[in-house]
Every structure is written in C-alpha cells, then in structure tokens.
Amino acid sequence: TGKNGATFGLMDSHDSDLMTTSRTGVFMGGALCGVPLMESIAQGSLLARIMEGYFETGKAALPDSDRVTKNRVHFLNHSGEENKALVTMTSPEGYTEGEAKAEASRCFLCDCRICWENCEMIKWFRKMPPKLGVEVYTDSQSGSSLSKRSLTRETYSCNICGKCKSVCPVGVDVGALMQFSREDRLRTNKNIPAFHDFWIGQFDFHTSEAFFVSPSKKEESCEYLFFPGCQLGAAEPDHVLKPYNYLQEKFNAGIMVGCCGAPAYWAGDKKRLADNIERIRSIWNSMERPTLIFACAYCENIFRLLMPEIKQESLYTLMAKDDSIVPARLFESAAMFDPCTARDDKTMQEGVRILAGRAGVAIEELDNPNRCCGYGGHMRLANPGLYEEITKHRNDASDKPYIVYCANCREVFRQKGKECAHILDMVYDIDLKKCLPTLKSQKENALEVKKKLMKRLTGDDFIPEKHEWDSIRLIISVELQDELDRKLIIEDDLKEAIWLAKQTGERFLSDDGVIQCSMVKSVLTYWVQYKELKTGEYEIRSAYIHRMKFNREG
C-alpha cells in the first residue's frame, strides 16, 4: 500500500526482522513501516527470499547468509572519508551523466571488511570469515587422504593473535577456527609436523634440560613466584637474572624458568600442552599457591586461559609502582609496540608506559596497536612470503625506534634491522649493540640462567647433558651463520650430522676435499657440506634441511 498506506491493523504485530504479521502468510515492510528508501529496496530483496522459504517450508526464517548481516552498516567506521553534499539535479528530468557519477561517488560502499583490513592472512588468501568457516568445517570432515584437505596452508598461516576478533563488531574469531583446524589435524594425523618441529624441540628443551624451579633460598614455599617464560632469558640472561634479584629482595619471590606451552598450543598438540600445564599446576600447589609474576604477555594469557585459579601480577606493573626504578634513556623518542596478547591487559600496558616515561622518552602511539609482530602461531615456515609481509608492515608502522616488552617481538625486529629495545634493556641499561644471539647461543643462555639460579638458590652445580659430538669445533662465517639461523638450523645438529657421518662412513668426498653428508631425523633431513681442517675441526661450507623424512631403505 506504500508510504502512509493502510496497515489493516497489523502494525502492532509487525516483526521488523522477518517482516511477518499476526496474520499467517501476510508480510509487511518498506516505506509503509517507516523504512527509508534505500533500506526499503534492500528489504524487498530480503523479503522475496523469506517468502520463498515460507512457501517451501511453511515457516518464515532469515536465509543463512542474512542472519548476522542485518544493519551491519552501523558497525562501520568511516573515519577519514570526505562528507560530500547531495548532488542537486539541474534538470527536472533527472541527473545528467556527470551528476549521476558524482552522486554515485558519495557511496561509502558499506560492506564490512574490518577484519580484511586488519589481518594480512585474510587478505593474503582473499577469503572472508564465512568462507573460511565453511572450509574449516568441510576440511575437518574430509577422508583419510591428506591431498583431499584444502585448507592446509591457511590453517598454518594464522598468527592466532586475536586481532580479527578484537575488531569484529560481532566478535568473529578466525584464529579460533584455525586453532580448531590445527588440533583436528593433529588428532587425525593429518598435521604437518615439520611446520612446528623446531619450536616443539625448543619447548621440550625448556621444559626439561633448561627447566628450573625453586622458592627463595632456604624456603619451602613462597608468596610470589616469578615466571619469566622461556624466551626472555634465552635472548638475554640479564632479562631474567636481574629482575629476579629485584623480586627476591623486595618480595622474597621464588622462580620457575620454563615454558607456558605456547609452542604446543600453536601446534595443536593438546596432550603436550595439558601435560605441561598439569606439571606447572602441581608445582604451584606444592609451593602453597603463590601469586605468579609474569614478564611475558603470552605466558600470562595462556595461564589466564588454562589456569584461571592462579593469581597474576605483571613484572612491569610492580616495577612501575617503585619510584626508585628509573630506566636508562636509550632513545629521545620512540614508538610503543604493544604485543598482541597484551591487548586486554591495560595494567601491563600502563606499567610499561610509566617506566618508559620515567626514562624521559617521548612516546608515540601506533595508529593500529596490538598487531602481531609475525612470530605468533609459528607460521613462518608454513608461509614465508606472508611472514615477510607481516614483519615488514610492523617494521614500517613507525619510523621511530620501538620499545617492546615481548622477547619474541624484540627478536623479530632486531632480525629485520629495526632499532628497538625491550623495556628491561632500559631498566638495566643493557647495551643495544650486543649482537643478536644465534640459535646455539640462545640455548647456551638458557642453560646459563639455570646454572646461576641453581647455584645461588640451592648451592648445587648444574651439569648440562653431554653428547659425543660436543667436542667437535665448527668454523662458520658470519654470513652463513645468519643464513643458518634463518633456516632454523642449530650448530649442534651440524655437529651431530658430521659425527654420525664419520661413525657410519656414509658421506661423499669431492676432489676438492669438500665432504657432503646427511642426517635423517623424525621429520627432517639435514644436509651438510664441510671441509675437515684438522682432527675435530671443520669448516662449514653450506647446510640446509628438507622438512621431510627421507627413507634410506630400498
């Protein structure tokens, strides 16, 4: 009946979502119900589909594609867009061609693409969340053949950083989809072990040989327990040892040096993760349930998710409350790079800013904070091109140096040549010119932290595990060492391969004296080219790995 038309007494029973009325089979919408012209046109299209469904099923229901999209225009942020005035027609017969184009150009193209604009992974694969959701479900229902799975690259390309959920008006979490896919693949033996093998190896190392826990000296329990995580001390031992000195003196805190389980979580290995969490929970209970002090936002997040009963404190918040702590002014001005998992931890963010401000550094806030540096999800091997794109975008977010408070962010930016400092570099005036530790040095740093803590708190001497190839000495150029670190090849693996080749005689010797050997492990095959300089000393010429296991039989 049109605008201001007859409603036949049905307006009070009108459902604005389904456009139904109290009279069966009678629908009502558009201008008659006070809807503006453009929305009336959209309602006409929607109502046609609702009515079609009604005729087929006898029920009025929203089509699946429209369940979450109604009025999504109201979620959109048009900041930065020019407010253009309505184009006035010069002729009563209608717009000229130029006027029509000018009027059409006023349209904001109101399609919600907030996640697309905030997530390189979504943009890289050009798939919006609804499509990804369907593919994840379909993928999980596929048969036994890995080749039938279509989502492999996408599954392992996600940082699982939570940015998509944080910006989505209705909280769609693509990371949770990809996490489900990873767990499902591992459960059904359709995972790609090589994508996570290196970091699972690190996890196993930090939860075994490098693991250490103790209350304060001569105590059996403690009120506070410092949990620095696994990467902080591996990157710089003083990032653990010096804060612990402070916490022990001020709070009589104990310390637990280990891994929260992030590598197992990102690999979808629920059993490995659960075993680690239960071990930590058991230790925590035995120490009379102390408050845990965190220096890593991701550790804090994992514990909050899986052990919510544990009371938490941030190292940086505690330090910010102590006016005697005045960090060194390593930069005149810097941009604050907040880690993705500190997004909802406003107290940790504030604590770091107080410390940086106390140093006299002028802080610049990033336009789009809390985006993953690229490390998250361990997606680097699954999609090197996307990893490079993400890290470049984060590097370029500001031309100023970065202040970070995540060891992984520090590692990524320093590898990419971005000037940056961890807030603990500032607190303890640590020389930023110190070389980025190699993968081998990171393991040595972690063991050095354990050695010093064990001697100090228990009086015992720590003796690292010994291997038959430890006595081998390798000569590696700086350029090659950088390449090996990029390939995630640790010096110890090269030593083992050379030792194994000498024991078995399985190696190739060329006329110029260069030897080539290989070593097959559970999911990787190593290849090494080297020259023997003298007994027990070798010059490495090149090395690489195939992220697959070569079968030597047949």
Task: Report the location of each language-model feature.
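Iron-sulfur-cluster electron-transfer modules
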Residues: 126-307, 444-455
